[in-house]
């Protein structure tokens, strides 16, 4: 029986939160940790060995490794990069500091001969996913930036609190940038099979307030504990689970919605063993559509500047 192997690149708070979530769920048989600071990957590997010993579904191997370990991996998860600074730094303001890191990672992963699925959480995640995909030349569907999966989870939670229902019974998505230009798609939200608008009507001002709460959640967390990691760690494990078990489940990840574009952007799509496919056909209201287009245009502009600053000549 083939073992399920993941290589984690970036052993900071986000990477290790993913690792802990994945280990608890018994997702992989082999875990390989890589970090620019070798002692960090070694120390975490040893620490997780101890946790693994008492897990109900222990992994067969947890070790610190190198990019050569990517060659036969099923999934590579990338969380490396510098985090947002407290005080309101946006994800897009991180781009200059993280693009060069992602370019180097992408080159190393490609050179290893890796042919699996890549899941990315490094911020700004849509831009980092776009850089990674273009540098590697991997099939677009095999690159899965986390997109708006965390934003959508936050929206689910905020709406569910207000209508007093389990979030699992609510289907509602955030689309666009994983960041300040995202759009909460209330028009397509549903409770069970019932449109949210028929289950509980929210005014436009209430919707704006909910969306603001969703968008400010990350800043609230960063300003109080310096970083977000448990939420996104759980989201990364959820994406990996969908890939490993070929669930073909709809998740709001970052995808190349336009085949002729290099831009990855948050949108619900089916996720399974071959990556993402079959983007959901959402009928957006005019205001939602304008917001999504504005978000796309913003990401496109940032990516073009980023690509040029990396010394690439296509733009």
Curated annotation (Swiss-Prot):
Chain residues that bind substrate: 84, 91, 123-126, 151-154, 228
Active site annotation, chain numbering: 178 (proton acceptor)
Compartment(s) where it occurs, according to its Swiss-Prot or TrEMBL record: Cytoplasm
Main location per the UniProt record: cytoplasm
Keyword Cell inner membrane in annotation: no
Keyword Cytoplasm: yes
Enzyme Commission number(s) from the entry: 1.1.1.27
GO annotation terms (biological process): glycolytic process; lactate metabolic process
UniProt keyword annotations, A-Z: Cytoplasm, NAD, Oxidoreductase, Phosphoprotein
Top-level taxonomic group: Bacteria
Modified residues (Phosphotyrosine): 219
Binding residues for NAD(+): 14, 35, 67, 81-82, 121-123, 146
NCBIfam families: L-LDH-NAD
Subunit structure: Homotetramer.
Function: Catalyzes the conversion of lactate to pyruvate.
HAMAP family: Lactate_dehydrog (MF_00488)
Protein name: L-lactate dehydrogenase
